[in-house]
């Protein structure tokens, strides 16, 4: 089940509601990444506290560990991980294609060696749909060939054509399995605007309830990613949700929303948190730096997260320098809370028709820097 309602537009920025089998999501939305069924350093209550509406699980990793037979015993990923809100799963393709020296690609699918025990494994559109059906994610993704940003035109065209054939197979398998959830198609085409449009037009025949933009944030220069967003975002179908995969910084989220994107996921806020890199309204802060050793202030005096309401920069600096687990948890709570606040503010700005003003103020504040 998927029902998307578009409430308001302000330029290309959109404010909507996405209804799924495990609940309703207000868009634009950021989805914390729970690769192995766990958002690193966060428990489900932490996620509820920061107002996370939906999280992402990784099909490839959950297939390898704990394995489908385990998750199936719990009726799906929700029961296994104790999360009652929506979940989106990727197709597993990105991770498999990252194993460039351990995989073989054919029209049928991809053969690769398990990085865990060396077993020979095979992933196809049909197998990806079977895995995601067992996981019972509210949103599943088609299997696509993940095109590197530096692909030649010929490589990108050949790749997107295979992804379109796999889109058809993914949809058929999804329907044959009687999966009650939603399946998204993925727009590919590397850094070629006309190929992106060709991919989008090719997907129209399958009438997926939502569409994702894939193959960005894969090593290409930032201006190239933004160029593709400017080209693709505004031509995505208005009545469907738009998902930008694997992106990104706070600035990337704002740029994406400004160009018609509704959904985002990225490991950046959690990974950076574990490395002591904190996002704030007034720029980024590196908590490991010695200047924070005696600082009694919170990370961000305007922030209402648990970390900022209760602890000093000095304490967080100490936790990071000593490698305490609590430091990673508090940093992660703060970063994910900050991302959720940005999304909530953008939703409100679009509702009020003041997105451009909000965007200008956001960039002005972020450029100011922390002290």
Curated annotation (Swiss-Prot):
Catalytic activities: 7-aminomethyl-7-carbaguanine + guanosine(34) in tRNA = 7-aminomethyl-7-carbaguanosine(34) in tRNA + guanine
List of catalytic residues: 90 (proton acceptor), 265 (nucleophile)
Enzyme class (EC, first level): transferase
GO molecular function: metal ion binding; tRNA-guanosine(34) queuine transglycosylase activity
Keyword list, A-Z: Glycosyltransferase, Metal-binding, Queuosine biosynthesis, Transferase, tRNA processing, Zinc
GO biological process, one term: tRNA wobble guanine modification
Binding site for Zn(2+): 303, 305, 308, 334
Enzyme Commission number, as recorded: 2.4.2.29
Pathway as given in its UniProt record: tRNA modification; tRNA-queuosine biosynthesis
Plastid keyword on record: no
UniProt-recorded name of the protein: Queuine tRNA-ribosyltransferase
């Amino acid at each position: 089940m998927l029902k998307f309602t578009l409430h308001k537009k302000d330029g290309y920025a959109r404010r909507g509601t996405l209804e799924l089998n495990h609940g309703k999501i207000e868009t634009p939305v950021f989805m914390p990444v729970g690769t192995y069924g766990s958002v690193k350093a966060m428990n489900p209550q932490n996620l509820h506290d920061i107002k996370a509406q939906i999280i992402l699980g990784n099909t490839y990793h959950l297939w390898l560990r704990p394995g489908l037979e385990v998750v199936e015993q719990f009726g799906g990923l929700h029961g296994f991980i104790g999360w009652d809100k929506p979940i989106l799963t990727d197709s597993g393709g990105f991770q498999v294609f990252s194993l460039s020296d351990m995989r073989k690609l054919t029209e049928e699918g991809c053969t690769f060696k398990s990085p865990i025990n060396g077993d020979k494994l095979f992933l196809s559109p049909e197998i990806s749909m079977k895995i995601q059906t067992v996981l019972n994610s509210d949103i599943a993704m088609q299997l696509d060939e993940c095109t590197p940003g530096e692909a030649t035109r010929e490589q990108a065209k050949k790749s997107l054509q295979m992804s379109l054939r796999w889109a058809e197979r993914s949809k058929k398998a999804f329907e044959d399995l009687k999966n009650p959830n939603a399946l998204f198609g993925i727009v590919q085409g590397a850094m070629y605007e006309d190929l992106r449009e060709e991919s989008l037009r090719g997907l129209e025949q399958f009438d997926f309830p939502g569409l994702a933009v894939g193959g960005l944030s894969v090593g290409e220069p930032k201006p190239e990613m933004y160029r593709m967003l400017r080209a693709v975002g505004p031509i995505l179908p208005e009545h469907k949700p738009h998902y930008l995969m694997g992106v990104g910084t706070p600035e990337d989220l704002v740029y994406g929303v400004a160009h018609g994107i509704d959904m985002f996921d990225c490991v950046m806020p959690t990974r950076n948190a574990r490395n002591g890199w904190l996002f704030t309204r007034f720029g980024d802060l590196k908590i490991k730096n010695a200047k924070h050793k005696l600082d009694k202030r919170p990370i961000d005096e305007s922030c209402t997260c648990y970390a900022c309401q209760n602890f000093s920069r000095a304490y967080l600096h100490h936790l990071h320098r000593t490698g305490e687990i609590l430091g990673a948890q508090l940093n992660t709570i703060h970063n994910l809370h900050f991302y959720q606040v940005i999304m909530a503010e953008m939703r409100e700005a679009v509702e009020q028709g003041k997105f451009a003003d909000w965007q200008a103020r956001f960039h002005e504040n972020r450029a100011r820097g922390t002290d």
